[in-house]
Every structure is written in C-alpha cells, then in structure tokens.
C-alpha cells in the first residue's frame, strides 16, 4: 500500500516540506532559526488570541484591562509576559536569521530574500502597533512620535498623519484601529512565511560552504527535525527563564503609568529591538532625511544581492569579508546602545558616526573588500 503521506493532497505538502525534503548534509545550527521563527509566530498568535479575549481597545479601559489580565485572569500574567517577551525572542531570532543570510550569501535566492525583507517590515509594524495597545505613557508617546514622522512626507504628510490617527491626535480611533491591525497582521505574516518557504523549496537550502549541495542531500526527517527540536527547547528555556524570573527586564517602567497626553516622558524610546533604527533616525537633524534613513536602514537589505561582488557565495573562506561583517555587527550593537541614550554629547556624535559606518559598510566597504579578495585569489 502506498504511504498516505505521499498520496493525500494535504499530507503531500507537509511531507515535501518537513519530512522527505532533501536538505544539505552540512547545515549548521545557524539554519535552525527558520523553524524557531515559526514557533515564535505560532506562540505569539496563540498568546495574543487569549489576550484579545480580555483586552478592550478603548482609551478609557485599555490600561485597566491589561491590569485586569495580569491580576484577575487565570495565568493572565503568564500569557501577557509570554506575549511581550515572545516578541523580543522573535526579534532575536529574526536578527540572527538575517545575519546568517548575510554571512553565508543566502541572499542570492532573490525571491526568498526579498519576501524575507517584506516579512521583517511586517513583523516590525505588528510589534510597533502591539506596543501601543497597553496604553501606557510609552505606548501613547511612542505612537505619537512614530506616526508623526509621516508628516515629513511633502504635501500629503499632515493629511496622512491625521488620516492614520482618525482625528487630530492619537486617541480612541487610533487605538481601535491599531488593535484591529495588530490582530490581522500576524496572519498576513504567517501567509507570507508560507510563500517564503515555497520559494526556498524551489531552490533548496544554502549551506555553510556556499557550494552546490545537490550531490550530498539527506532527508529533513529525522535529522533536522530532531535538530530543530533541540533548538526549540533551548529557545523555550531562554524565554521561560526571562518570563518567570525577570519579565520586565526588557520593558520600559514608564509603560506602567497610564497614558497622559499632558505629560511627556523625559526620554521617549522604543523597545530594544527598534533602537538601532531609532538611532539612525535621530542621527540626521532633518526630519525628512531622518525618516528616509530610517526606512533605508531596513530597505538596504533588498539591494545587498546587487552588491555581491565576490566570486564565492559564502564568507566561510573569505577572512577579510568576515572581518567587515563582524565590524557591521559591532556597529549595530553600538547603534542599539545609542538609541537608548539621551540626545546629548557625546551620544549624538557616536550615533552619527555609527549610522555613517552602517551605510558605508554595506554600500561601499563590503563590496570593495570582496573585490580585493577576488584579486588576491587571482580570480
């Protein structure tokens, strides 16, 4: 009898994606993050669903409803903190996943890479809108500052901002629509992730050597299923430790103060995973310039395949490029640190330098380094 998993229309899809999928025999733990992101997304949708059962998207009751979830709902505190810190876990996995793609030249799969960048934008939008929902001080002022950036768009800016707000300031209409969008976006992300996977399976996975691995493939199950389970257990352990021991470590204390339009917090800053982009935004004194730099800091990922000048795909055998890559990583850490600092000397100058290095590194220095390596190898 033919195996049902190979004949049933639905099982066939699962089989070809997670069971009989031919995978390179040498992919390292850096290839675990795709499955970890899938787990994060499922966890976020489930915890979010249970939070939505108790949350009210009204300016008068939003803050109280979150307090009610934490105090009165059975394990509400656990669901809330799993959701909040799950977002941090999501972004840690995202950044590592993108970093892996940059290091090993996975961006040469154009469709997969571009949909990945689109996914990054969608997840960032989802996280931003989710941060507004508890309606604390940082929620309100974060929403005000970030939506206000759109007013930098010439001619239509002001109208666009008021259209997004649903009034003349961030208010009830804004909160209600942000809740609606925050609810729907993760499902769009899930659909996009399906397309991301579809395009990846057209080409097969890349591997650490960057060479063609058609001659040496192994089935995904049991080899990589068991490897993914180990990765998942490590991530779940890390998330559980964070949630159960220091759930507020990554949050802002200001968000425990109910939103007050008449009182601005001394330092408005986003969650840690947006700080690098926030630092780039602040490093340009012009409003429109800052907004453009902010968008380009992520959009630049789309041009990376065009800037690939090396004769080898991966950085595994390219020590100079490796050096440049790790300088870029250090620069991103610097930007993240600067984003959380007040706007004063010397942080402003450090931020401007780090922003300049970020763009120069990607557009100029790394492609030139690759060309030098080609020369050294007489290619």
Swiss-Prot record:
Gene Ontology MF terms in the entry: metal ion binding; ubiquinol-cytochrome-c reductase activity
Subunit structure: The cytochrome bc1 complex contains 11 subunits: 3 respiratory subunits (MT-CYB, CYC1 and UQCRFS1), 2 core proteins (UQCRC1 and UQCRC2) and 6 low-molecular weight proteins (UQCRH/QCR6, UQCRB/QCR7, UQCRQ/QCR8, UQCR10/QCR9, UQCR11/QCR10 and a cleavage product of UQCRFS1). This cytochrome bc1 complex then forms a dimer.
Comment field (misc): Heme 1 (or BL or b562) is low-potential and absorbs at about 562 nm, and heme 2 (or BH or b566) is high-potential and absorbs at about 566 nm.
Membrane-topology annotation of the record: Multi-pass membrane protein
InterPro entries reported for this sequence: Cyt_b/b6_C (IPR005798), Cyt_b/b6_C_sf (IPR036150), Cyt_b/b6_N (IPR005797), Cytb/b6-like_sf (IPR027387), Cytochrome_b (IPR030689), Cytochrome_b_C_euk/bac (IPR048260), Cytochrome_b_N_euk/bac (IPR048259), Di-haem_cyt_TM (IPR016174)
Transmembrane segments: 33-53, 77-98, 113-133, 178-198, 226-246, 288-308, 320-340, 347-367
Keyword match Ribonucleoprotein: no
Top-level lineage group: Eukaryota
Function: Component of the ubiquinol-cytochrome c reductase complex (complex III or cytochrome b-c1 complex) that is part of the mitochondrial respiratory chain. The b-c1 complex mediates electron transfer from ubiquinol to cytochrome c. Contributes to the generation of a proton gradient across the mitochondrial membrane that is then used for ATP synthesis.
Cellular location(s): Mitochondrion inner membrane
Main location: mitochondrion
Cofactor binding note from Swiss-Prot or TrEMBL: Binds 2 heme b groups non-covalently.
Official protein name in the record: Cytochrome b
Cellular component, GO, one term: respiratory chain complex III
Organism of provenance: Suncus stoliczkanus
SUPFAM superfamilies with a match to the protein in the record: a domain/subunit of cytochrome bc1 complex (Ubiquinol-cytochrome c reductase), Transmembrane di-heme cytochromes
A single BP term in Gene Ontology: mitochondrial electron transport, ubiquinol to cytochrome c
Residues holding a ubiquinone: 201
The protein's required cofactors: heme b
Keyword field contains Membrane: yes
Family designation: Belongs to the cytochrome b family.
Binding site for heme b b566: 97, 196
Matches recorded under CDD domains: cytochrome_b_C, Cytochrome_b_N
């Amino acid at each position: 009898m033919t195996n049902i998993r190979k004949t049933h229309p639905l099982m066939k899809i699962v089989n070809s994606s997670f069971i009989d999928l031919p995978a390179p025999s040498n992919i390292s733990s850096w290839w675990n993050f795709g499955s970890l992101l899938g787990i994060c997304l499922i966890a976020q949708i489930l915890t979010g669903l249970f939070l939505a059962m108790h949350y009210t998207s009204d300016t008068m009751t939003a803050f109280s409803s979150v307090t009610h979830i934490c105090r009165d709902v059975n394990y509400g505190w656990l669901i809330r903190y799993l959701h909040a810190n799950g977002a941090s876990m999501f972004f840690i996995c995202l950044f590592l996943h993108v970093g892996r793609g940059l290091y090993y030249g996975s961006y040469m799969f154009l469709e997969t890479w571009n949909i990945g960048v689109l996914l990054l934008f969608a997840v960032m939008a989802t996280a931003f809108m989710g941060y507004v929902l508890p309606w604390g001080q940082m929620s309100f002022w974060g929403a005000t500052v970030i939506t206000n950036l759109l007013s930098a768009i010439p001619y239509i800016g002001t109208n666009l901002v008021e259209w997004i707000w649903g009034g003349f300031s961030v208010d009830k209409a804004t909160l209600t629509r942000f809740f609606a969008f925050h609810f729907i976006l993760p499902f769009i992300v899930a659909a996009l992730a399906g397309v991301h996977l579809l395009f990846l399976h057209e080409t097969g996975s890349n591997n650490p050597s960057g060479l063609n691995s058609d001659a040496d493939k192994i089935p995904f199950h049991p080899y990589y299923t068991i490897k993914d389970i180990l990765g998942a257990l490590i991530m779940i352990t890390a998330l559980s430790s964070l949630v159960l021991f220091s759930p507020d470590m990554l949050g802002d204390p200001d968000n425990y103060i109910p939103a007050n339009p008449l009182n601005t917090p001394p330092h408005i800053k986003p969650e840690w995973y947006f700080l690098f982009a926030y630092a780039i935004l602040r490093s340009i004194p012009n409003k429109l310039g800052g907004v453009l730099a902010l968008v380009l800091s992520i959009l630049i990922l789309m041009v990376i395949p065009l800037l690939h000048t090396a004769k080898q795909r991966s950085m595994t055998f390219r020590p100079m490029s490796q050096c440049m890559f790790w300088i870029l990583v250090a620069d991103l850490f610097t930007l993240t640190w600067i984003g959380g600092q007040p706007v004063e000397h010397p942080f402003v100058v450090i931020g401007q330098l780090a922003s300049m290095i970020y763009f120069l590194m990607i557009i100029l220095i790394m492609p030139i380094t690759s060309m030098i390596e080609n020369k050294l190898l007489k290619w």
